[in-house]
Amino acid sequence: MTVNEINNINLEELISMGSFACECGKVHSPGVSKVIVEKGAVNSLPALLEEIGAKKPFLLSGHDTFEAAGASVTAVLENNGIDYAKYVFPVSPVRPTEYTVGSAFMHFDYSCDAIIGIGSGVINDTGKMLARATGLKYIIVATAPSMDGFVSGTSSMDRDGLKVSLYSTAAWAVVGDLDILCQAPMHMLVSGVGDMLAKITSLREWKLAEIIVGEDYCPVTAALVQKALDKVMSSTEGLLKREPEAVSSVMEGLVIAGIAMNYAGVSRPASGMEHYFSHIWDMRSLAFEDAQFEQHGIQAGLGTLYTLMAYEELINKGYKPDREKALNFVKNFSLDDWNGQLRSFVGPGAEAMIEGENREHKYDAAKHAKRLEIIIDRWDEITEVIKTLPPSAEIRKLMESIDFPTSAACIGYDKDGVKTTFTMTKDIRDKYVGTRLYWDLGILEEIAEVFD
């Protein structure tokens, strides 16, 4: 499979061809078997259950999502004589915590032979966890095109206060009923746009990681995501009118992003530094009563805007690697002081971040010096990748056109809060992202001034 070939394949063809040998040297598999995005899609449930030999599905839902689609799902099952059991979380919102996963397990009916999630983000992630543990096929009935995790093989959860991606299982089938999706709250619809905008920066950071630390990169997978992103960005006007074609474009784009993660075997094609803004805000909302949070896609969209602003600062100010400056910066860096800042801002989740550094040693002076030489040698390549990013003003304008927040003030963060969040995004995962590049160059705090 080549870039040109992938650009001429639609979602249905992508799924039907299954696994394929790619020009990157790997064999890619989509993970998902069925994706139905159309009006009346819930009516496909009996046939889907029959295809996997399931007689009694277990329905997992939140209170709000059951109100949105529960009646439609249960009516289809009952009209076709299909028995089912269900658990509807009594709290709203449902948070992606150990309690939520444990509650799902404790209410699971072991006479069931399939799992149907009714919802979006947290419900879907929890349903995938339940499916992996039970070994059952999982179907998600989406209630909003709000995030890209429908078919990915991981679940984004809060464990011990740290946002982590846990291996779960990809949905066997995605049911996107446009009669339901088009009626989702507008807030949820634009959230899906935000999660797609995140691909603007995640794709470039994936390429930067290949250049600097030798991470595997697949141009075919990247092209697939870029094509879906372009389609979503051209559909925003129709989305505001709840036009089925526009809503379908967003839903399919989010599914394609999940397939891309399955192709890559990691979240790189869909998630980078911009997502770590969101993760930190989620972690703080669990740790501190007065810390606010938003829909994942809203936070990821904000993170995208801030990430673009930071890369622009790097280019516009004409920064170039300064070996002496970078080495002195690292020499004077105090890991103990930094860990104290993490604990103060993030709360208990900081312990897992600190433990991650104990395993990775990204702040080790010798490792830094090695990366720095690569950065110096390949600076022109690095900046060429960064220069392919669209202007932040262009993305801000698009966001404003759909009433998308453009400042983290919407969740209570002032400029200092954004700057602190920014500096800590390098500590969430073991990925090489923009803030690691700025740290390696010894200019992290200087770049952060762009948020003043």
Predicted regions and their residues:
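ATP/NTP phosphate-donor binding region
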Residues: 2-114
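C-terminal charged capping/lid subdomain of soluble metabolic enzymes
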Residues: 2-22, 317-452
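Solvent-exposed alpha-helices and their adjacent loops that cap or buttress functional pockets
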Residues: 27-29, 52, 107-110, 131, ...
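Gly/Ser/Thr-rich loops at beta-strand to alpha-helix junctions
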Residues: 41, 63-68, 119-124, 145-146
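Generic secondary-structure signature for well-ordered alpha-helical cores
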Residues: 50, 78-82, 162, 179-186, ...
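A short, small-residue-rich loop immediately preceding and capping a beta-strand
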Residues: 108-130, 134-144
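A glycine/threonine-rich phosphate-anchoring loop and its flanking beta-alpha core
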Residues: 132-231
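Active-site segments that bind and position negatively charged phosphate/pyrophosphate groups
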Residues: 224-379, 384-394
